């Protein structure tokens, strides 16, 4: 949930105004965690999105379900996507490329060790912001 909300928020989808920081498993927001605990067990509600925002959600959904995740579980794939974007936007220098981001990811997260899948993840997730 954290990683998906992070990416949607960065794509401009109005899902809240959460501050994210780096954590063991990538971008994390304590405010979002608090909101999730508060809402846990309550009846859900329907979110109405503009056509543009619905398209953004759809684009992210398609990337999350991409066959390019190779041997990663869904959870690890989303962790790689969100972590790569966070590293590229918040940690690395402005001119960092895919190899730089993937090298940093693999250094910080040795369990995300499929280099080709990580390169694909970087290209896919950064494509959301072009």
Where are the language model's segments positioned?
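Domain-edge interaction signal
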Residues: 1-130
